[in-house]
Amino acid sequence: MSQERPTFYRQELNKTVWEVPERYQNLSPVGSGAYGSVCAAFDTKTGHRVAVKKLSRPFQSIIHAKRTYRELRLLKHMKHENVIGLLDVFTPARSLEEFNDVYLVTHLMGADLNNIVKCQKLTDDHVQFLIYQILRGLKYIHSADIIHRDLKPSNLAVNEDCELKILDFGLARHTDDEMTGYVATRWYRAPEIMLNWMHYNQTVDIWSVGCIMAELLTGRTLFPGTDHIDQLKLILRLVGTPGAELLKKISSESARNYIQSLAQMPKMNFANVFIGANPLAVDLLEKMLVLDSDKRITAAQALAHAYFAQYHDPDDEPVAEPYDQSFESRDFLIDEWKSLTYDEVISFVPPPLDQEEMES
């Protein structure tokens, strides 16, 4: 929020009162979820259309308050072409005592990868460019020691020039309920995170990229499981059942016992599964869709794979500034999280206008 307080105006949209600076005009609702509602708006200062998100009850509980602080800290930190960043953050409150609402402003992204896959069969060159950009964004995110956790086509925004941004970090851990049944939330999830096998690492995101890449190449969801067990069966049918080395790493005894009860299956030949695909694409998929997360390719390694030869530029694949997430282990009260969040709102410095390059 800029230093001198702007003039705000109030408007009711979908039974929610929005109180925003005059800079943002023509608000129109575009969606809402558990954690907030989003409006498209015209930013009179830049001439661009933006997305304004009003967080829902940001401080109603300690969990909400910490989530609000986490989302703001993450968005403020992200400064990369392939990752959604923060254009503005504001509150109508004039003081910490009045502070109850948080609004976040980001680029308005037109389509997501879901829309793109449904509409057209993609060429191999399209797939190269899209997956390259996801990995370029992931290298940046992972370098800050952040894991997205929820990469899927609907969390990848693409404009008409095929430029891509990663959205919606896995800020809130999904509940068991949201992961149950025939749901996309789970189809792109690495087995170790879906089934709580073990402590997971950044390569959970690489598994998701493999699932997305396979879908772009074939036009079909790779592992559309109807439930957790069906999902695991679909995965093991492709990549084979785990060997002794991986079984030893699975800390959950019940998961280990269940896997050992299944019939042994060999890994399929990916070239026979992805018929007609570029052999380099198939080779990369084999390195991403590895059951043992310790042996999965990293984002930085994947960028150097021959499949991306025409896009890879080691001097233009930046890493992030260090990100201090020591707050994650803190047990603060609501008012303490609220005060920390207020400080982050007040201290926000908007990006230079020429960085707002991506209009969709």
Swiss-Prot record:
Q: Which Gene3D superfamilies match?
A: Phosphorylase Kinase, domain 1 (3.30.200.20), Transferase(Phosphotransferase) domain 1 (1.10.510.10)
Q: Any idea which residues bear Phosphoserine here? A: S2
Q: Does the keyword NADP apply?
A: no
Q: Where N-acetylserine occurs along the chain? A: S2
Principal place of residence: cytoplasm
Q: Where does ATP bind?
A: V30, G31, S32, G33, A34, Y35, G36, S37, V38, K53
Key words, A-Z: Acetylation, Apoptosis, ATP-binding, Cytoplasm, Kinase, Nucleotide-binding, Nucleus, Phosphoprotein, Serine/threonine-protein kinase, Stress response, Transcription, Transcription regulation, Transferase, Ubl conjugation
Which PANTHER family does its entry note? MITOGEN-ACTIVATED PROTEIN KINASE
Q: What's the protein here called?
A: Mitogen-activated protein kinase 14
Gene (UniProt): Mapk14
